Amino acid sequence: MAVPKKKTSKGKRNQRHAIWKAKAATAAQRALSIGKSVLSGRAQGFVYPMQESDDDES
């Protein structure tokens, strides 16, 4: 017969939530840092397409 599992404690729940929030904050900080480097023109770790002018095609 199926028996329900024990309830997860508040401490364990809060710990998991804190880890999840910390990972999200780290990802947001990295994204902001990459965005700043792209805007300032100092980005060298990756390649992104540059806009081409239409005069070359005519």
Curated annotation (Swiss-Prot):
Pfam families: Ribosomal_L32p (PF01783). GO terms for biological process: translation. It comes from the Bacteria. The keyword S-adenosyl-L-methionine does not apply. GO terms for molecular function: structural constituent of ribosome. GO terms for cellular component: large ribosomal subunit. InterPro entries: Ribosomal_bL32, Ribosomal_bL32_plant/cyanobact, Ribosomal_zn-bd. Keywords: Ribonucleoprotein, Ribosomal protein. Belongs to the bacterial ribosomal protein bL32 family. This is Large ribosomal subunit protein bL32. The gene is rpmF.
